[in-house]
């Protein structure tokens, strides 16, 4: 709501926000209103399926592979350090210093996020995708996602290239969205 109200989707009718954290949440906005869906799960992107094994009927979801918490777990495994000593900040710092293993963790996230965004673009076709939460503070995130979108598009040119940006309010978008919701309720 904050991004539609005063942020990166201010002049847009439709938007998808994606926030990485313990899971992967977000929102689906259509005609400037949040779409909740019949079962109130629209925007719960954690459950989107990425991959699986048909022989054992096992699936891997978006959150398991790409949530910030999952990236930090991979970081701890690669560095053979306790999970409590790891963080997203350390992951990004090591990647920016040239640590190839940390760059691979980030690239895997960018790649799978690009695929999910392209799938959602094909189904829903919003004006813009906005990446929020703490991860959006890192410019390399939007650059990485857009790089993979371009590479995938080169292989599948029928896909529409979506607009992907960082949330204006980054990690505070949820707080400002709650304020907007409160003000809207108060006016009514």
Please give the residue ranges for each predicted region.
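ATP-binding/phosphotransfer module of carbohydrate and carboxylate kinases, centering on a glycine-rich
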Residues: 5-11, 50-188
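Glycine-rich phosphate-binding loop of actin/hexokinase-like ATP-binding domains
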Residues: 9-66
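Acidic/histidine-rich catalytic cores of soluble enzymes
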Residues: 1
């Amino acid at each position: 709501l904050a991004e539609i109200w005063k942020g990166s989707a201010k002049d847009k009718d439709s938007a998808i926000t994606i926030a990485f954290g313990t899971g992967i949440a977000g929102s689906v906005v259509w005609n400037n209103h949040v779409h909740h869906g019949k079962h109130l799960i629209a925007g719960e992107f954690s459950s989107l399926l990425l991959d699986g094994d048909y022989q054992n009927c096992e699936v891997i979801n978006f959150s398991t592979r790409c949530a910030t918490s999952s990236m930090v777990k991979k970081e701890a495994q690669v560095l053979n350090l306790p999970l409590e000593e790891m963080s997203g900040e350390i992951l990004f710092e090591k990647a920016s210093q040239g640590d190839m293993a940390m760059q691979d963790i980030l690239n895997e996230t960018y790649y799978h996020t690009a695929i999910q965004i392209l799938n959602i673009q094909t189904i829903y076709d919003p004006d813009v995708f906005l990446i929020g939460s703490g991860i959006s503070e890192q410019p390399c995130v939007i650059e990485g996602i857009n790089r993979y979108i371009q590479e995938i598009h080169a292989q599948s040119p029928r896909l529409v290239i979506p607009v992907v940006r960082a949330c204006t309010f980054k990690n505070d978008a949820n707080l400002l969205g709650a304020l907007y919701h409160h003000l809207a309720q108060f006016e009514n």
